[in-house]
Amino acid sequence: MSQQRTLNNTIRATGVGLHSGNKIHITLRPAPVNHGIVFRRVDLDPVVEIPASGDLVTEVILCTGLTRNGAKVQTVEHLMSAFAGLGIDNAIVDLSSAELPIMDGSSAPFVFLLQSAGILEQNAAKRFIRIKRSVEVRQGDKVAKFSPYDGYKLGFTIEFDHPMIPHKQSYYEMEFSTAAYIKEISLARTFGFMHDLEDMRERNLGLGGSMDNAILLDDFRVLNEDGLRYGNEFVRHKILDAIGDLYLIGGPILGAYEAFKSGHALNNKLVRAVLADETSWEWISFPSPAAEQPPVVYTHPACI
């Protein structure tokens, strides 16, 4: 049986908002079966709950943001990616601000928090969204596509005219599992170019950005003294983002995702396109130990 998962304990952390530069408190709490992932703006009175749902996405420039009843929560993609990577179905995320902390620019700190809180398997079958037929969305030369696949596979191509991002390091593909996610994807940091950061600062964005939480490039090189964590860290981070953006579809996915130069906007467009076409997907569970086993491997909680 592939069971739903939540946290075993509540855990708290503090960090800086990438765009606001403000100190942010985050609390991750267990949630009951079929609750899903829900963000709560506890700095507001009354508190506003914002479900992690693709149809609530309103911000897709530089991050993924959700809005409900006028309340926003931004930069959700890295935490959502960690939830997906560890197979967390149900959780409550309390926030003291409209933005999640950027941590080190990857999802690894969130993975560590979830590991520290412990993972609890619940007495209910995990519900997968299985892609039944191909769905593709485009925006100019950018493409994002889901196809049927017995498992969860992600392939991504980036294209940047920069000597540190050569063509041979512009494509990456992974067969999704908890172990592969933690080892191959979770450490990949967000990245940006010095000229873009200067433009963002002029618009009061990226105020919390630094080489402590992002890879920064000038026209020729990586400026971070410690260099890259992976030779192709840039494209791996795009997969990290995609895993988080796509988890807003409402559950773990069985299908193949292929993207060319996609980003938060196109990822959300793909999620909405799938959900709008009920013939392209179905819910499926694996409730019995004797029944067919799910083709996606989630590491046992005791081993994470």
Curated annotation (Swiss-Prot):
The keyword Ligase does not apply. Its cofactor is Zn(2+). GO terms for biological process: lipid A biosynthetic process. GO terms for molecular function: metal ion binding; UDP-3-O-acyl-N-acetylglucosamine deacetylase activity. Gene3D superfamilies: lpxc deacetylase, domain 1, lpxc deacetylase, domain 2. Belongs to the LpxC family. This is UDP-3-O-acyl-N-acetylglucosamine deacetylase. It comes from Xylella fastidiosa (strain Temecula1 / ATCC 700964).
